[in-house]
């Protein structure tokens, strides 16, 4: 028994000694792993085409961090196995089944995925290249890629995964395959495409949200150039701008909504014609804002006895101009469909502004003669109208005095929807803010655009908070809430009343965009800090290359 315990103790000691652990004592290791060899000759040329694996040796134990996201092989090879997968090792190994192309330089870009086992020190931007020919191609393209609209995150609020690729120019371009050469931009947007062979290429950059190394048309933001690149010598300083992708118009779904059903589309159609198919509903109204993704079909389910006891199959036809179809929904009337009015805006009125309130239904009639506006218990004259831009909103105008508090009483049944649905009584309390609580901003545009443009003040999420549609050189924003803003101009080059983004499918570039950025500013856009009672004046020269996108 004692002999057995002795052997067990020795075995445990040997296992413990064989483990890879952190060194005891001394300073923290900050040195990344170092490559010491590979299974390919040091010249890395004339590599056999039937080679099926790459092995790279290092001077210390390593592990691979997010290797499936970081590893990019150009031209693409479909690999089958990567070592180490999780445990540490002193080498990495990639295996594949493909036969290598003749006279081709292959580049394995590992990004920052190779890290030492103990401290996770990355071997930065590690590349390994070899050639099946008698030389390694050494041309490169380097540059930066950035968001044309100044957005630092993607549409879902996540960090971008920016990929840049080159396609060989052919009679038929297939962008549904991986690019022939591909790389990823670093967090600052800098990229390098290395070990390139001379030839003609089309370049593309995109936010690879699903990590498939292929641009998904209509789903991912994209940057491209219309002209081909005739690569005879290396190119540096290329600038790519990434734009929201134009989506093809496509029906998505129909859902039950307060007062009817809501039909949604991809691609923001200009116009959608919707008609009921069948007897129900017989009385309905369709609302759709130009280039909105939503179409609301309003009807009185209770009045027409639609889906009251059991669900009913309702059918509607739609016509977007490019597609027509008939769709259906099993409709069950919601238990509660009351019409409500509320103030989703602000209880504080900026100087010179009107009071607004909104309803969850479209409004067809109001009876303001029955309403009451008071300040300090004294009635005050006012006018009210349904908004021409949004029929769910009401605008109330009066001589609002700064610093005073107001009370607007809207009795029951004085806000009416198109099929006689009536609102409940409601009271709004609000205050006319003082001018000294706000600031102002004036910008003088040097070499302004020839066409009309939207000039916008954006919040930290790059959402427009204030904007003007103009063609003037001197633009003034007054009564701005104190905050940090960014300044952007969108140009209506085609004079259609909308700003149009790039369309990769037709190789149509976006309309012009200008981002306000002072020389030397490290941020994408210069911040404008608005303070109470402060007036800021700036000159903005739109001819500077750093500010113009196209």
Language-model regions, residue ranges each:
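Acidic, glycine-anchored loop motifs typical of Ca2+
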Residues: 208-217, 492-501
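Gram-negative outer-membrane assembly/targeting C-terminal domains
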Residues: 523-550
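Short, composition-biased linear "edge" segments at structural boundaries
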Residues: 225-233, 509-518
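Long, low-complexity intrinsically disordered regulatory regions
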Residues: 239-243, 540
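C-terminal motif of bacterial Sec signal peptides marking the signal peptidase cleavage site
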Residues: 13-16
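Acidic, low-complexity Ser/Thr/Gly/Pro-rich repeat segments typical of extracellular/periplasmic
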Residues: 18-151, 155-206, 218-224, 231, ...
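Sec-dependent signal peptide recognition
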Residues: 2-10
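Short, surface-exposed loop/turn motifs with a glycine/proline- and acidic-biased composition
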Residues: 481-484
